[in-house]
């Protein structure tokens, strides 16, 4: 979340940034934050003054008694009692103001960087780069859900029977392809210096608040009400929360972690042709990169992550493009985000397969993730993460873009992992 110092020192810039994200009532909300913070500070000032007076009077009472000034001592005792009673009310008032302030800050998104373009939604995102070769498919090319049925790779109906829509069952070479991609992505991450983590896929509320999924995405997360736990929408949540309430040594940075997990998203309100097959699922596999770094290095770290994801798509021989997201299309927590999309020749549309984001200090402030400098100062870290990669749409694109009259060709980079060159 934003720090009070950010808001008080750069009030106008913060409001402009929130308006770029199309955050409703930005000015009014920030004014409410400042008012609540002033109330908390003013109450604290009065409380501190009262506590100082109580300490002073308490010390004087003993001296007055020794000097035989019983009336003055009694007056001092009565004043101490009055102040203590008043301080109880002041403490409650200050605690309430602090709670109100914290709850307000939780509802405010991160401020986008100046390099983030203006815009309302996906149509305003800026194409930064395009790569890969366009695929020439047979005239009777099929979308992946029909290919999955033809080659008995994925059973969507069986998933509906077992669980419901959005929970496919992978079979045979479909399951092998899924596992091959996971291992390929993890191996590539390790080659790039990432440490593999195997985290829980269920987290508590504090973890959800730490990375910003709560309260913003509460309705999109599966909630186990009996135990008050949440199924993770991304490995970002448990992996980043490893460093909640941690002060790192400067020499430990950067931290580079990767994790493969199942991810769970309710995707409430998603209907229509864009959700067919693997395009939008409630449960899916994903490999995530998480980095923690010093502020002065996070721009370089972000670029390294972008290069890593681009390298994966190149090795998979997929046509792709990189988008710089506009303010209105960015996530609640991101300060800067790039999306990677692969082109589906069979569906004639672009499919998002990765988002790579820099969160500046926004998550770190929530998490209290800090580092100690050589000068013994404690500073907030920068956190970054990105999908490398999300599997469903990658599988969809691989099936569709590599279909031939003989079957589905496997990219060379994956053959050592699949053990086969063709699905037929």
Language-model segment annotations:
Residues 27, 129-424:
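TRNA-recognition modules of translation machinery and tRNA-sensing kinases, especially anticodon-binding
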Residues 1-135, 153, 157:
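N-terminal alpha-helical targeting/anchoring segments
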């Amino acid at each position: 979340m934003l720090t009070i110092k950010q808001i008080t020192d750069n009030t106008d810039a913060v409001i402009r940034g929130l308006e770029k994200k199309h955050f409703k009532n930005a000015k009014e909300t920030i004014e409410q934050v400042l008012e609540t913070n002033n109330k908390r500070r003013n109450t604290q000032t009065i409380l501190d003054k009262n506590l100082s007076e109580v300490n002073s009077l308490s010390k004087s009472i003993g001296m007055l008694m020794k000097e035989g000034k019983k009336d003055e001592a009694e007056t001092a005792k009565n004043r101490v009692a009055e102040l203590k009673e008043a301080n109880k009310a002041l403490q409650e008032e200050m605690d309430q103001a602090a709670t109100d302030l914290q709850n307000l800050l939780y509802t405010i998104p991160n401020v986008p960087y100046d390099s983030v373009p203006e815009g309302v939604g996906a149509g305003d995102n800026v194409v930064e780069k395009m790569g890969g070769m366009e695929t020439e498919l047979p005239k009777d090319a099929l979308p992946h859900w029909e290919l999955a049925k033809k080659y008995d790779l994925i059973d969507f109906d069986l998933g509906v029977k077992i669980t419901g829509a959005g929970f496919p069952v992978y079979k045979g070479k479909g399951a092998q392809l899924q596992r091959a991609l996971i291992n390929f992505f993890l191996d590539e991450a390790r080659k790039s210096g990432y440490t593999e983590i195997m985290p829980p896929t269920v987290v508590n509320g504090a973890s959800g608040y730490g990375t910003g999924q709560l309260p913003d995405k509460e309705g999109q997360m599966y909630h186990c009400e009996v135990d008050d736990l949440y199924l993770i929408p991304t490995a970002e949540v448990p992996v980043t929360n490893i460093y909640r309430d941690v002060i790192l040594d400067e020499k430990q940075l950067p931290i580079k972690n990767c994790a493969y997990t199942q991810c769970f998203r309710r995707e409430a309100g998603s209907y229509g042709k864009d959700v067919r097959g693997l395009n939008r699922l409630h449960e899916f596999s994903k490999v995530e990169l998480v980095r923690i770094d010093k502020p002065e290095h996070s721009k370089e770290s972000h670029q390294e992550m972008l290069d890593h994801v681009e390298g994966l798509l190149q090795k998979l021989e997929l046509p792709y493009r990189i988008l710089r997201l506009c303010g209105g299309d960015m996530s609640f927590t991101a300060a800067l985000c790039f999306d990677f999309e692969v082109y589906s020749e069979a569906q004639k549309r672009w499919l998002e397969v990765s988002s790579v984001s820099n969160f500046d200090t926004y998550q770190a402030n929530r998490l209290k993730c800090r580092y100690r400098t050589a000068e013994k100062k404690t500073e907030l870290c920068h956190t970054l993460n990105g999908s490398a990669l999300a599997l469903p749409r990658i599988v969809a694109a691989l099936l569709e873009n590599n279909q031939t009259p003989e079957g589905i060709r496997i990219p060379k980079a994956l053959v050592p992992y699949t053990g086969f060159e063709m699905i037929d």
